[in-house]
């Protein structure tokens, strides 16, 4: 963890697929809090012209590139999902680069605290960048329903993703704060506002 007197201090925000991480992060953004999304950073590091994209194409073949020169993220996701060894190779390449992007963007934050949004906050070790950790928790049946609706995925596809994500109990064990997102957006917004006012009272993310 970084020094507790760092300004702004960093809140980690995570949760499983379909938990409402992005919706919660948007609520914080609407309150004037700077956020950095690890998913966005993972896209930046594989943009055309970046060294990581060249290494991926050399390793997996240029069939993973679209006609525009951009990475076919869907094809890559399918390939590594079916091959753990290749997934580990990709993670070893990308995680350090993604973390560099995250640190660079967090350093530009001007709000009283900033947020790192990441679905793999715990698994990737990114939790070491934050002073406090908020988990967006949602019952599994709602995760499945929301993801099927959002991504037009089958129940089997969503359940397969849930199986490879960190177990809910492990995620909750790392949490300083838990927001159970099992109601409507108005309720989510009110809970984020409550947490926001609490976070404004903290120094370095600590009471």
Curated annotation (Swiss-Prot):
Q: Where in the cell is it found?
A: Cytoplasm
GO BP: any one term: coenzyme A biosynthetic process
For this protein, the Enzyme Commission number is: 2.7.1.24
GO terms for cellular component? cytoplasm
Keyword Cytoplasm listed: yes
Record domain DPCK: where: 10-207
Primary location group = cytoplasm
Q: Which GO terms describe its molecular function?
A: ATP binding; dephospho-CoA kinase activity
Kindly indicate whether the keyword Nucleotide-binding belongs to this entry. yes
Where ATP binds, per the record, is at: 18-23
Family matches, as CDD domains: DPCK
Enzyme kind, highest EC tier: transferase
Per the record, what are the reactions this protein catalyses? 3'-dephospho-CoA + ATP = ADP + CoA + H(+)
Q: In which pathway does it act?
A: Cofactor biosynthesis; coenzyme A biosynthesis; CoA from (R)-pantothenate: step 5/5
Question: Which controlled-vocabulary keywords does the entry list?
Answer: ATP-binding, Coenzyme A biosynthesis, Cytoplasm, Kinase, Nucleotide-binding, Transferase
Entry-linked SUPFAM superfamilies: P-loop containing nucleoside triphosphate hydrolases
User: Pfam families given for it?
Assistant: CoaE
InterPro entries, sorted = Depp_CoAkinase (IPR001977), P-loop_NTPase (IPR027417)
Question: HAMAP family, from UniProt?
Answer: Dephospho_CoA_kinase
User: Sorted alphabetically, which NCBIfam families does this protein's record hold?
Assistant: dephospho-CoA kinase
Q: Which family does it belong to?
A: Belongs to the CoaE family.
Q: What does this protein do?
A: Catalyzes the phosphorylation of the 3'-hydroxyl group of dephosphocoenzyme A to form coenzyme A.
**What name has this protein been given in UniProt?**
Dephospho-CoA kinase
Protein's organism: Pseudomonas savastanoi pv. phaseolicola (strain 1448A / Race 6)
Identify the taxonomic lineage of the organism of origin.
Bacteria, Pseudomonadati, Pseudomonadota, Gammaproteobacteria, Pseudomonadales
């Amino acid at each position: 963890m970084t020094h507790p007197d760092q300004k702004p201090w960093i809140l980690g925000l995570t949760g499983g697929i379909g938990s409402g991480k992005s919706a919660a992060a948007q609520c914080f953004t609407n309150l004037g809090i700077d956020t950095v999304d690890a998913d966005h950073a993972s896209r930046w590091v594989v943009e055309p012209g970046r060294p990581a994209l060249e290494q991926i194409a050399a390793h997996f073949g240029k069939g993973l590139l679209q006609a525009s020169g951009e990475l076919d993220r869907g094809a890559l996701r399918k390939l590594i999902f079916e091959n753990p060894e290749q997934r580990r190779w990709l993670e070893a390449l990308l995680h350090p680069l993604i973390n560099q992007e995250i640190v660079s963007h967090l350093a530009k934050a001007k709000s009283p605290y900033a947020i790192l949004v990441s679905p793999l906050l715990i698994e990737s070790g990114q939790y070491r960048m934050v002073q406090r950790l908020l988990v967006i928790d949602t019952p599994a049946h709602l995760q499945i329903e929301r993801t099927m609706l959002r991504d037009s995925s089958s129940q089997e596809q969503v359940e397969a993703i849930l199986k490879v994500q960190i177990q809910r109990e492990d995620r909750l064990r790392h949490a300083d704060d838990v927001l159970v997102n099992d109601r409507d957006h108005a309720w989510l917004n009110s809970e984020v506002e409550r947490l926001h006012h609490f976070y404004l009272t903290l120094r370095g993310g600590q009471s």
